[in-house]
Amino acid sequence: MSKKGRVLVAMSGGIDSSVAAVMLHEQGYEVIGMTMKTWDYANLGGSKKETGCCSLDSINDARNIAVSLGFPHYIVDIREEFGDYVINHFNKEYLDGRTPNPCVLCNTHIKWDSLLRRADKMDCDFIATGHYAQVRSENNRFVISKGLDENKDQSYALWGISQQSLSRTMFPLGHLHKTDIRAMAAERGFMDLVNKSESYEICFVPDNDYRGFLKRRNPGLEEEVRGGEFVMEDGTVVGKHEGYPFYTIGQRKGLGITLGYPVFVTEIQKENNRVVLGREEGLNRNGMWVDQLIMSKYENLKGIQKQSITKVRYNDDGTSSTIEQVGDEMRVLFHEHVKAIAPGQAAVFYEGNDVIGGGWIKSSFKQD
């Protein structure tokens, strides 16, 4: 074994994870590559793209990098556990009138757990991924912080990783920009990686048609929920909709209703199959409750009011807020209005570039 240690690298076949593996190999680590097959397009009725996540082409791309550098590469089939946890949860959340974030679930409960189990079997000291984030040890805690490249930062999707997992995690790309990664790949002759398009879709909904996914996943759902009422915030019925699972908070397009002015989905009421509509200002909230907390920088914040920049979705710049842990939940008071807070999405709290912790949005509120 290398003096620096043995590291198991998650390799998707994309440029980021491939360059992460290359960097660690060149730094003298004993690298083992692992590609996780999480699902397949045909069984789930999605697009049958040959170059997407988990495709044969992507698996071969990862293997070719390993072969060219002389380190072993393994393929691990985790479709069953991915389906049982991530896909079933995604489906259930929409049926509960919430808006899920499967990537956070996958990172926390599937990728890291799978990597660490295999790492232990292979006597690996560390695991590594191609995420744009950083991790460090401070005050007996392992702290996640933003990647140097703000445009590519992925810390929002990593808040759910446990302290034990973080203690063995490496993010080789955290201190680099995407332009650096492309340059490194080009310098080493990996032009296929440089020219490879990136995917920003949910991997098991590759056509981005979550409505179609739900219909395929739940035969008879469409008939069961069709015909519910669109109502205004004062309860006035203004039309019929296709079923509450097919709408999300903040949605404006695809409502199929014309009122003479723009309206948005402000609330989803599963219990009576109602979708509440309102003007844009009706999306404004200045507080929320977050549950299922996992803390990074601090063990807990019980009884402590702390200033934070809080993100309520992936592409959110964040909003200044005061957070206070109450029992097992976080009460968040924003210093200005935030639009379209969707229950089921992840909320992540930042102190500077550091992740304080995160959880799942339970509910939002508006107070004077």
Swiss-Prot record:
**Does this entry carry the keyword tRNA processing?**
yes
Q: Which InterPro entries match?
A: MnmA-like, MnmA-like_C, MnmA-like_central, MnmA-like_central_sf, Rossmann-like_a/b/a_fold
UniProt GO MF annotations: ATP binding; tRNA binding; tRNA-uridine 2-sulfurtransferase activity
Return the EC number.
2.8.1.13
- Keyword tRNA processing (UniProt): yes
Q: Which domain of life is it from?
A: Bacteria
The site feature described as Interaction with tRNA is recorded at 131, 345
Keywords of the record, alphabetical order, are: ATP-binding, Cytoplasm, Disulfide bond, Nucleotide-binding, RNA-binding, Transferase, tRNA processing, tRNA-binding
Q: Where is this region: Interaction with tRNA?
A: 152-154, 313-314
An example GO BP is:
tRNA wobble position uridine thiolation
Q: Which reaction does it catalyse?
A: S-sulfanyl-L-cysteinyl-[protein] + uridine(34) in tRNA + AH2 + ATP = 2-thiouridine(34) in tRNA + L-cysteinyl-[protein] + A + AMP + diphosphate + H(+)
Where does the record say this protein resides? Cytoplasm
Which positions does UniProt annotate for ATP binding?
10-17, 36, 130
**Active-site residue list:** 106 (nucleophile), 203 (cysteine persulfide intermediate)
Q: Which GO terms describe its cellular component?
A: cytoplasm
| Major subcellular site | cytoplasm
Q: Which cysteines are joined by disulfide bonds?
A: 106-203
Major enzyme class: transferase
Query: What is the stated purpose of this protein?
Result: Catalyzes the 2-thiolation of uridine at the wobble position (U34) of tRNA, leading to the formation of s(2)U34.
Q: What's this protein's name?
A: tRNA-specific 2-thiouridylase MnmA
What is the species of this protein? Cytophaga hutchinsonii (strain ATCC 33406 / DSM 1761 / CIP 103989 / NBRC 15051 / NCIMB 9469 / D465)
The root-end lineage is: Bacteria, Pseudomonadati, Bacteroidota, Cytophagia, Cytophagales
